[in-house]
Curated annotation (Swiss-Prot):
Pfam name, any one: CcmE
Organism field: Bordetella parapertussis (strain 12822 / ATCC BAA-587 / NCTC 13253)
Keyword Iron: yes
GO terms assigned for molecular function: heme binding; metal ion binding
Stated name of the protein: Cytochrome c-type biogenesis protein CcmE
Residues noted as binding heme in the record, renumbered to the chain: H124, Y128
NCBIfam families found in the cross-reference section: PRK13254.1-1, PRK13254.1-3, PRK13254.1-5
InterPro entries for this protein: CcmE (IPR004329), CcmE-like_sf (IPR036127), NA-bd_OB-fold (IPR012340)
The organism's place on the tree of life at top rank: Bacteria
Regions crossing the membrane: 9-29
Topological domains annotated Periplasmic: 30-153
Length: 153
């Protein structure tokens, strides 16, 4: 009876240990895949991580888009109307990418102060902007239009 009870306790303890290990691995994987959002003002205030990926959102400043000769490399400026972040991106842009329109870029900040984007997301209709970008523009006191819509949170 004691050996049977001992084996059962050992089996339960092993199962709990394996569950704890699996949970720790899943949480670690999720934490390493998190990408936080920051406005250009927050980036300049050093609230964004100095290393690692994050997102910057705002408006593409009018007149800031410069294309390289290869047709894929692009430089532009993301602004929240208070501060600006220069961005470099190599790749195909979304069809809705335009100067003066909302954009969210994901990537890392270079030592030279240029944000190296690995992904560019443009707003998908005339009155839409990602909620984080809209909040950042509201805090800056400038919204692109009075009819701005955001996703339900």
């Amino acid at each position: 009876m004691t050996t049977r009870r001992g084996r059962r306790a050992l089996l339960i303890a092993g199962g709990v240990g394996l569950l704890a290990l699996a949970a720790a691995l899943v949480l670690n994987a999720l934490r390493s895949n998190l990408v936080f959002f920051f406005s250009p003002t927050q980036v300049h205030a050093h609230e964004a991580p100095s290393s690692g990926s994050f997102r910057v959102g705002g408006l593409v400043r009018a007149g800031s888009v410069e294309r390289a000769a290869d047709g894929l490399t692009l430089r532009f400026v993301v602004t929240d109307t208070v501060r600006e972040v220069p961005v470099a991106y190599t790749g195909l842009l979304p069809a809705l990418f335009r100067e003066g329109k909302g954009v969210v870029v994901a990537g890392t900040m270079g030592a030279d102060g240029v944000f190296r984007a690995t992904e560019v997301l443009a707003k998908h209709n005339e009155n839409y902007m990602p909620p984080q970008a809209a909040d950042a523009l509201r805090q800056a006191g400038a919204l692109p239009s009075a009819t701005l819509q955001t996703e339900a949170r």
